Amino acid sequence: MGANSLPTDATLDLDEQISQLMQCKPLSEQQVRALCEKAKEILMDESNVQPVKSPVTICGDIHGQFHDLAELFRIGGKCPDTNYLFMGDYVDRGYYSVETVTLLVGLKVRYPQRITILRGNHESRQITQVYGFYDECLRKYGNANVWKIFTDLFDYFPLTALVESEIFCLHGGLSPSIETLDNIRNFDRVQEVPHEGPMCDLLWSDPDDRCGWGISPRGAGYTFGQDISEQFNHTNNLKLIARAHQLVMDGFNWAHEQKVVTIFSAPNYCYRCGNMASILEVDDCRNHTFIQFEPAPRRGEPDVTRRTPDYFL
């Protein structure tokens, strides 16, 4: 259903649910189940390399920081007025993973052509059991059903997107097993994120100052140098790789002589890092503009996390 279709009972219901979510109020388990069924039908038809048209606003990690996502929409424009591409990591660490991921999935169902939601390394059963989403679902719903519904849906999220055949967008980075975009188009993504291999690498790898491939300190994926980025961009006729996955203090960070950019959209990450967030606006002429933003004002939340994480995924 297009954004301009006549409203039906279903879209009126969905509009009410989106409006409820925008107030940071979760849906019922039954509503989540029905929403995710519809989302699955839409996502099943999307490619591992999902084509996206400009103008589009590209966003990085959100990590359950719902009020900052609301601020992002305030600054970047509401969906569907603005076309959005999110590069994963909607859940874990922040206090509102449930509301954050439900809102993004709700917008996807309501405006499927206006928002693209890619998979991040945190959109996984294993990671969410450790970093907060599982516990949050238990706390808010009294059981793990909503966690299971969402983690089953995560298997269908596209892995990468391609803006106007020029900007390759993904959560993590490149893989020694992948030379071309067709390599990515050809694998079966509907599974839990594997511990190794090309699908894992796309969600876990990081650019590095050192040339070539390196062992990642994260324990999954690889580091890749400028020589790798240049070769990949050349082979696939790309101008830029846009990715998320790493905290950058200014909200964005260029690497590899502007062949790669990191975008991070969770300001004051974990409510303690003091970083700016940013989003990247790509206009009709493919010009890039970064918009930086600070945390939204918050009420009734702790200023610090209860426990400092040992390291950041």
From Swiss-Prot:
One MF term in the entry's GO annotations? metal ion binding
Which Gene3D superfamilies does the entry mention? 3.60.21.10
Keyword list, A-Z: Cytoplasm, Hydrolase, Manganese, Metal-binding, Methylation, Phosphoprotein, Plant defense, Protein phosphatase
Q: Which InterPro entries match?
A: Calcineurin-like_PHP_ApaH (IPR004843), Metallo-depent_PP-like (IPR029052), PPA2-like (IPR047129), Ser/Thr-sp_prot-phosphatase (IPR006186)
- Provide the binding site for Mn(2+) 2: 89, 121, 171, 245
Q: What class of enzyme is it?
A: hydrolase
Q: What is its main location?
A: cytoplasm
Q: How is the cofactor bound?
A: Binds 2 manganese ions per subunit.
**Protein location:** Cytoplasm
Q: Which cofactors?
A: Mn(2+)
Residues bearing the modification Leucine methyl ester: 313
Pfam families the UniProt entry points to: Metallophos (PF00149)
Quote the EC number.
3.1.3.16
The residues listed in the UniProt record as binding Mn(2+) 1, with positions renumbered to this chain, are 61, 63, 89
What catalytic activity is recorded? O-phospho-L-seryl-[protein] + H2O = L-seryl-[protein] + phosphate; O-phospho-L-threonyl-[protein] + H2O = L-threonyl-[protein] + phosphate
Q: What is known about what this protein does? A: Functions redundantly with PP2A3, and is involved in establishing auxin gradients, apical-basal axis of polarity and root and shoot apical meristem during embryogenesis. May dephosphorylate PIN1 and regulate its subcellular distribution for polar auxin transport. The holoenzyme composed of PP2AA1, PP2A4 and B'ZETA or B'ETA acts as a negative regulator of plant innate immunity by controlling BAK1 phosphorylation state and activation in surface-localized immune receptor complexes.
Please give the subunit comment from the record: PP2A consists of a common heterodimeric core enzyme, composed of a 36 kDa catalytic subunit (subunit C) and a 65 kDa constant regulatory subunit (subunit A), that associates with a variety of regulatory subunits such as subunits B (the R2/B/PR55/B55, R3/B''/PR72/PR130/PR59 and R5/B'/B56 families). Interacts with SIC/RON3.
- Name of the protein: Serine/threonine-protein phosphatase PP2A-4 catalytic subunit
Organism whose genome encodes this protein: Arabidopsis thaliana
